[in-house]
Curated annotation (Swiss-Prot):
Domain of life: Eukaryota
Annotated protein name in UniProt: NAD(P)H-quinone oxidoreductase subunit 1, chloroplastic
Function: NDH shuttles electrons from NAD(P)H:plastoquinone, via FMN and iron-sulfur (Fe-S) centers, to quinones in the photosynthetic chain and possibly in a chloroplast respiratory chain. The immediate electron acceptor for the enzyme in this species is believed to be plastoquinone. Couples the redox reaction to proton translocation, and thus conserves the redox energy in a proton gradient.
Entry keyword annotation includes Oxidoreductase: no
Reactions performed catalytically: a plastoquinone + NADH + (n+1) H(+)(in) = a plastoquinol + NAD(+) + n H(+)(out); a plastoquinone + NADPH + (n+1) H(+)(in) = a plastoquinol + NADP(+) + n H(+)(out)
Gene coding for it: ndhA
Pfam family, one: NADHdh
Topology versus the membrane: Multi-pass membrane protein
Alphabetical GO biological process terms: aerobic respiration; photosynthesis, light reaction
CC per GO annotation: chloroplast thylakoid membrane
Assigned EC number: 7.1.1.-
Subunit description: NDH is composed of at least 16 different subunits, 5 of which are encoded in the nucleus.
Parts of the chain that traverse the membrane: 27-47, 98-118, 129-149, 165-185, 203-223, 248-268, 269-289, 297-317, 340-360
Amino acid sequence: MIIYATAVQTINSFVRLESLKEVYGLIWIFVPIFSLVLGIITGVLVIVWLEREISAGIQQRIGPEYAGPLGILQALADGTKLLFKENLRPSRGNTPLFSIGPSIAVISILLSYSVIPFSNHLVLADLNIGIFLWIAISSIAPIGLLMSGYGSNNKYSFLGGLRAAAQSISYEIPLTLCVLSISLLSNSLSTVDIVEAQSKYGFWGWNLWRQPIGFIIFLISSLAECERLPFDLPEAEEELIAGYQTEYSGIKFGLFYVASYLNLLISSLFVTVLYLGGWNISIPYISILELFQRDQIFGTTIGIFITLAKTYLFLFISIATRWTLPRLRMDQLLNLGWKFLLPISLGNLLLTTSFQLFSL
């Protein structure tokens, strides 16, 4: 009996140990995801505040100043207000499509953050096909917009959804060709490998200098993918009221609002990773890898700071562009994508391929 009791105690202790291992394993899985989501939310709140302050400066007026110091909590106050607003649904609309559309738009953009390297070895999923995964996932978002427009049973919403789909297709191809040119230069589809390939030559090793034409095309295409002025035709207020968002209210409207800024942030991060050297400080004789080897926490912190500094520099350009340029017509937008950007990006890809072949 004593031997039997001892065996039972041993088995129970083993089961408890395995249970603790499973709990710790789940914690190690969810902590990075939760940290990334929290960082993304904070980044979006900062972008909203920056846009309001920059737009106020451009228009020579006073921006938000009552919600928190310098109006920093204004975006949080607006989000809280949307949470408590009534969630309306069109009586003759397609309820499943109407409800699922915003979720598809947000989730497809959130998944793209998993392949962004914020610092050395600080990436949620270091995949060999990270860039390809981003392009594949980003092509899902227009489906959600089209579903929202169709499910609203509103001519303005449906036309906005069609415009969003047409605009996304028109500018997704030049953007993909620019990304392929970067992949050829780096000999990899991994975002981490692309950053490390630029770090070999410091500041002059950035793909911005090796691919200036591709950078300009990527810049224009990313703004069009984000549906920002001068490419905000899917939600042009003077023509379509609010486009595919016309029938939405409350939290679902808030999801579209958040999705637009999430898309802007992910585009800026990919500009940093693909063309601006990522987390590298790009100062001669100073390397993030050396700092990382000396002090891992300090090196990681510096890498995150450099990545975000480059990202918000591009965000400033995007925000200033919105408040300074007029909106294009639909025919001008499509002509720019199909007749100019597509041939130039294809020629840039062929030129890059030729250089890579001759350098072998």
